[in-house]
Amino acid sequence: MRKGLAPCGPSQRVSSNAPTSGAGGNLAAVVAILARDAGDLPIAYQLLIYPATDMRRGHPSHQTNGNGYLLTTETIDYFHDHYIDEPAHDHDWRASPLLHPDLSGLPPALVLTAGFDPLRDEGLDYANRLVAAGNRATYVCFERQIHGFITMGRVIDEAHAAVTLCAGELVRALAR
């Protein structure tokens, strides 16, 4: 990433965001930590949309929301098993950023979740850890929604509200 952004020059700011889903939020969170530790990548903001932050998959929402909605426990397990090849890697912060011992000094963040998403609780826990570590983080849960709702603007009105919220936060963050 640093090599790809080098032509932009040192004054350019980057947002670490996840326009896809939980896996994109996972990668964005990990990249923000790596960039902080490297000290040379100017990430201005983290937009974490229903992020997967704990590969152990033990949060209560995995049980309560793991069946009957778009993203199921079976689907999560399928993707997990294609991403993580050793069970011990679930405990590595590079797979589970929630487990990093030091989340201080990270860019401001918006963590957006859905009420009926198996990933809801780990997103909330990550937002809480960011705040506890002294970062500016906002947590918003669209309580009546499922994983992936933000891409369903033609059928779900709250998707428009979520996109508007995300766009507004990015505009403010990148204007600084």
Q: Model segments located where?
A:
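Alpha/beta-hydrolase superfamily serine-hydrolase fold, recognizing
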Residues: 1-176
